[in-house]
Amino acid sequence: MTADLEDTRIPVKLKLAALWTSVMFCYLYADYFGLYIPGSLQKMLDGIMEPLGPTTQNMLLGTSLMMAIPSVMIFLSVALRPVPNRWLNIVLGTLYSLIILLTMWSWRFYIFFGVIEIALTGLVVWHAWNWPRASTLKQ
C-alpha cells in the first residue's frame, strides 16, 4: 500500500528554510521555558540577563543579532542564488552549531533543545554541503 504514495522531491532551498524555521522555534520555546526557572523573572526585573550579566544596550544588540541571523536565513535560503546560498548556510550552520554547543545551560530542557538545535544546524550544513549539482538533477 505504501508503494502507491506519491513523494515529490523537495528543493534544497526549501529544506534549508524549513530547518532554519525549526531552529527559530526551538530558540523561542527554550527562551520562553527559561522564564519559568526560579528567580529568572526577578533577575530580568533587576536588569540581569542570565547568563550574560547586566543588561546593556550592547548586550541586547548582540542577542538581537544572534536571533536575527537565523530569522533572516529563512528568507535568504529561498532567495539567494545557489553558490552564495550554499556557502552562507555552511558557514552560519557551523557557527550556530558551535555557539549552541558552547552556550548550553545545565537545565535539562536547555540541553534537550540544544541537542535538537545542533542536529538542525548540522542538517543545514549537510544539505548545503551536499547541494545537488545541475548534472545530477537532469538524470
Language-model-detected regions and their locations in the chain:
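Cytosolic juxtamembrane helix and N-cap/initiation of the first transmembrane helix
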Residues: M1-C26
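Hydrophobic alpha-helical transmembrane segments of polytopic
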Residues: L16-V23, G62-M66, L88-L92, Y96, ...
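Hydrophobic, membrane-facing alpha-helical anchors
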Residues: A18-T21, Y36-L45, L61-M73
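Helical transmembrane-bundle signal
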Residues: W20-D31, P70, I74, G93-T103, ...
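Hydrophobic transmembrane helix segments
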Residues: V23-N58
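Juxtamembrane helix-break-helix junctions at the cytosolic face
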Residues: M67-W87
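Membrane-helix boundary connector in multi-pass membrane proteins
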Residues: N85, L95-G114
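Membrane-water interface at the C-terminal end of transmembrane alpha helices
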Residues: T121-Q139
